[in-house]
Regions:
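Phosphate-coordination loops involved in phosphoryl transfer and adenosine-cofactor binding
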Residues: 3-5, 79-80, 144-146, 201, ...
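Beta1-alpha1 glycine-rich phosphate/pyrophosphate-binding loop at the start
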Residues: 4-73, 158-184, 264
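Cofactor-binding loop segments of dinucleotide-utilizing enzymes, especially the Rossmann-like FAD-
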Residues: 11, 34, 137, 153, ...
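Residue-level detector of alpha-helix initiation sites
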Residues: 12-13, 36, 112-114, 155-156, ...
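A Rossmann-like FAD-binding core segment of flavoenzymes
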Residues: 70-96, 101-103, 165-273, 313-322
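Glycine/small-residue-rich loop that forms an oxyanion/phosphate-binding "nest" at active or ligand-binding sites
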Residues: 77-141
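FAD-site-proximal beta/loop scaffold in flavoenzymes
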Residues: 113, 123-142, 246-294, 303-306, ...
C-alpha cells in the first residue's frame, strides 16, 4: 500500500488545477486519470471561451497543456481507475484496478458523463460503431454526405447539430417540446441553418438497424432509422437516418461515493457553500461532479483551485502538511 498526502481522482480541468496548486504547495499529489483522461474536454472541438486563447484552442490540446504543466511541478499521474473508496476513517483507502493506496486528503474531480436515452440500443450501438455517438467532434467526420439526427434541446444539442452541418446533408434536431432550451444566440443560428430540420414534440422510442458486412466479412448492426413518438398526439413515425447523436445532458460520476457522501437527487455531490469541503473532513470535491449549474471548463478549473487550497489548509491544521 503506498501512502500519499493528497490523492486527486480525475483529470479534467478541475483535477488538473487541483494538482497544479497542490504540487506547487509541495504536497506531491498523486492523480488517478480514470477511464476518460482529460475528461469531457477531450471530446469537444474548439474551446473558444477559455481565457487566454484568443484564437480558441482544441479541447484535447488544452488538456495536454494542463497535463504538461502539472507534471512540471512534480505531480504523479497514474493511468488507473479508482474502483473503491473507503472514506470512513483517515487515512482514506483507495483501491484501483492496479493497487491499494492511502491518502491523508482526497480531492474528488470525477466529473460527469453523457447520458444515454435509456432504450439500451443507443449505448450498445455507440460502443460497436453502429452509428450512434455522444460526441459530434469525435465522430462527425464519419457521417460526411449522410442524413443524421441529434436528440436534445439544450446548448450542447444545438452546438452538436451546428457542428454536424459541416459533414451531413441534413441534421434532424429531435426535441420533446416545441421550443429549444438553448441560449437565444444558439437557437437563432440553428433555426437559420437550412441543413437543420427541427422535429418538434418527438421522442426516440427505438433505434432500427440493418445488418451490414464489413470489407473483412464481419457482420455489424448499423442504424437505418429512428422510431419516433409524438409527445402531443402519441402517433408514431419512422425517420430514416444513418447516424444518431445523443445530447440530453450529463450524469455525475459519483457511484463510487454512494452511501458515504451526501448527494442531491440527481447524484451531484453536496459541498459546503462557498467551499469545496464535503461533510467528511479531508475530503473535497470540485468540478462538474459538484456543479450542475455552470459546468464550464473555467469554473471547473476555478473550483479545482479552491479544493487544493482547502486541502492544503486542512492538512496544515492537522499537522500533516510537512
Amino acid at each position: 500500500v503506498s501512502h500519499h498526502k493528497v490523492v486527486i481522482i480525475g483529470t479534467g480541468p478541475a483535477g488538473y488545477t487541483a494538482a497544479l496548486y497542490t504540487s506547487r504547495a509541495n504536497l506531491a499529489p498523486l492523480v488517478f486519470e480514470g477511464a476518460q483522461p482529460g475528461g469531457q474536454l477531450t471530446i469537444t472541438t474548439e474551446v473558444e471561451n477559455f481565457p487566454g486563447f484568443k484564437q480558441g484552442i482544441m479541447g484535447p490540446a488544452l488538456m495536454d497543456e494542463m497535463r504538461e504543466q502539472v507534471l512540471r511541478f512534480g505531480t504523479t499521474i497514474k493511468s488507473e481507475t479508482v474502483l473503491k473508496a473507503d472514506l470512513q476513517s483517515n487515512p482514506f483507502r483507495l483501491t484501483t484496478d492496479k493497487g491499494e493506496y492511502t491518502a491523508d486528503a482526497v480531492i474528488i474531480a470525477t466529473g460527469a458523463s453523457a447520458k444515454w436515452m435509456g432504450i439500451g440500443k443507443d449505448e450498445v450501438l455507440s460502443r460497436s460503431g453502429g452509428g450512434v455517438s455522444a460526441c459530434a467532434t469525435c465522430d462527425g467526420f464519419f457521417f460526411r454526405g449522410k442524413e443524421i439526427a441529434v436528440v436534445g434541446g439544450g446548448d450542447t444539442a444545438v452546438e452538436e447539430a451546428l457542428f454536424l452541418t459541416k459533414f451531413a446533408t441534413k441534421v434532424h434536431l429531435i426535441h420533446r417540446r416545441d421550443k429549444l432550451r438553448a441560449s437565444k444566440a444558439m437557437q437563432e443560428r440553428a433555426l437559420k441553418n437550412e441543413k437543420i430540420q427541427p422535429e418538434w414534440n418527438k421522442v426516440v422510442e427505438d433505434v432500427l438497424t440493418a445488418t451490414h458486412e464489413t470489407p473483412m466479412g464481419e457482420k455489424v448492426e448499423k442504424i437505418r432509422a429512428l422510431k419516433l413518438k409524438d409527445t402531443v398526439d402519441g402517433s408514431h413515425s419512422e425517420l430514416p437516418v444513418e447516424g444518431l447523436f445523443v445530447a440530453i445532458g450529463h450524469q455525475p460520476n459519483t457511484s463510487l461515493f454512494a452511501g458515504q457522501l451526501p448527494m442531491d437527487e440527481t447524484g451531484y455531490l453536496k459541498v459546503e457553500k462557498g467551499s469545496s469541503r464535503t461533510p467528511i473532513p479531508g475530503v473535497f470535491a470540485c468540478g462538474d461532479v459538484q456543479d450542475h449549474v455552470y459546468r464550464q471548463a473555467i469554473t471547473a478549473a476555478g473550483s479545482g483551485c479552491m479544493a487544493a487550497i482547502d486541502a492544503e489548509r486542512w492538512l496544515a491544521e492537522q499537522g500533516l502538511a510537512e
